[in-house]
């Protein structure tokens, strides 16, 4: 039986996904310090955890519309609920974007390296990723992206701050970029890590959904600062016509009652969110300082991870770190998630050992 022949042509030509792939070796993460997937080691709000337990009794009931969580999110950002779409993580929303708006012959302009889900989105739906390298500062090269747009371009994607490079482009830069994108090209801005940013000019573009007459989609997730990666919860903010179109996807009905209730509780527990952010920022600064003292080049981070050049092969460093029972990530350079201080210190001690310092 040749299953490959049964696949769609788009899936046959799609390269292997890099989503969640961190090493060629299979690791038993249960025995390791997990610093490879940008997970929030502080977990979710205790209030959210309690609500999950309480709402489990409703797990036998459908919730077709997710009305309550949509209303809460809409109020938080100053929109109507018709501007909000809920998904099982922002990854599900990315998939919905592709199913709704992409087809054979379309191109998606984006920088690399970035979140691999966007590359998958293009290929799965018959489109082609038109890749522009990040600039020398490991930032999205917005200027080169504009030059790459042509008559085949259906969508442009900006991840800000970017994963895996941890860098950002200023609100002013992104707004100018959006102004210059042709009106028939959809603009997707993924703000998964924005809540970790401390730079004054690293801001959300949500307001542009109202202010500009352009097809702008803003993606948000509960997987990062809200610590709900395993719960699967995210949302999109866009013009109501875009939301209505995406709502026609089968995947638009994919979020459990427990996830919705937990998300509401998490949004209402800002004290816990501030606690997480404060500790992640401290850990980020600690790792940055220690790596620089070890002679590594560290790219300024506005996220929950640090991207750095240890002047050695990133895949080799990742495997060496695995021998120290620490799981880390790699792209063109190395990436380490920021955790509680004891985890950060274990990572630095392992780096000193590996680098012979």
Which role fits each region the language model picked out?
Residues 66-107, 125:
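Phosphate-binding glycine-rich loop
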Residues 142-151, 164-187, 191-223:
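Active-site pre-lysine segment of PLP-dependent enzymes
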Residues 280-281, 290-324, 338:
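Conserved PLP-binding catalytic core of the aspartate aminotransferase-like
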Residues 320-323, 327, 331-357:
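PLP-dependent enzyme catalytic core of the Aspartate aminotransferase-like
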Residues 1-60:
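N-terminal "arm"/small-domain region of PLP-dependent enzymes with the aminotransferase-like
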């Amino acid at each position: 039986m040749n299953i490959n022949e049964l696949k769609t042509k788009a899936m046959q030509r799609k390269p292997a996904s890099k989503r969640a792939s961190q090493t060629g070796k299979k690791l038993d993460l249960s025995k390791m310090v997990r610093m490879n997937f940008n997970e929030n080691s502080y977990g979710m709000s205790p209030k959210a955890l309690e609500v999950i337990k309480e709402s489990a009794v409703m797990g036998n009931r459908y919730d077709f519309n997710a009305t309550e969580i949509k209303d809460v999110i809409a109020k938080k950002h100053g929109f109507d609920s018709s501007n909000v779409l809920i998904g099982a993580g922002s990854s599900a929303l990315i998939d919905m974007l592709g199913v709704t708006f992409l087809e054979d012959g379309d191109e998606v302009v984006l920088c690399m390296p970035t979140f691999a889900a966007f590359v998958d989105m293009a290929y799965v739906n018959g489109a082609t990723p038109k890749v522009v390298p990040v600039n020398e500062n490991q930032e999205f090269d917005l200027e080169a992206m504009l030059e790459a747009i042509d008559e085949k371009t259906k969508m442009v994607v900006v991840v800000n701050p970017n994963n895996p490079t941890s860098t950002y482009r200023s609100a002013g830069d992104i707004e100018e970029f959006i102004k210059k994108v042709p009106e028939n090209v959809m603009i997707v801005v993924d703000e998964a890590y924005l809540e970790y940013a401390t730079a004054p000019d690293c801001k959300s573009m949500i307001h542009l959904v109202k202010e500009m007459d352009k097809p702008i989609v803003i993606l948000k997730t509960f997987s990062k600062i809200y610590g709900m990666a395993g719960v699967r919860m995210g949302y999109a903010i866009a013009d109501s016509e875009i939301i209505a179109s995406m709502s026609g996807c089968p995947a638009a009905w994919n979020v459990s009652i427990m996830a919705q209730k937990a998300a509401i509780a998490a949004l209402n527990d800002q004290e816990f969110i501030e606690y997480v952010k404060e500790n992640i920022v401290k850990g980020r600064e600690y790792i940055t300082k220690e790596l620089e003292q070890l002679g590594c080049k560290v790219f300024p981070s506005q996220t929950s991870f640090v991207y750095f050049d240890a002047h050695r092969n990133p895949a080799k460093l990742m495997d060496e770190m695995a021998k120290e029972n620490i799981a880390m990530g790699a792209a063109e350079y190395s990436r380490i998630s920021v955790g509680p201080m004891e985890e950060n210190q274990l990572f630095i001690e392992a780096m000193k050992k590996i680098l012979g310092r």
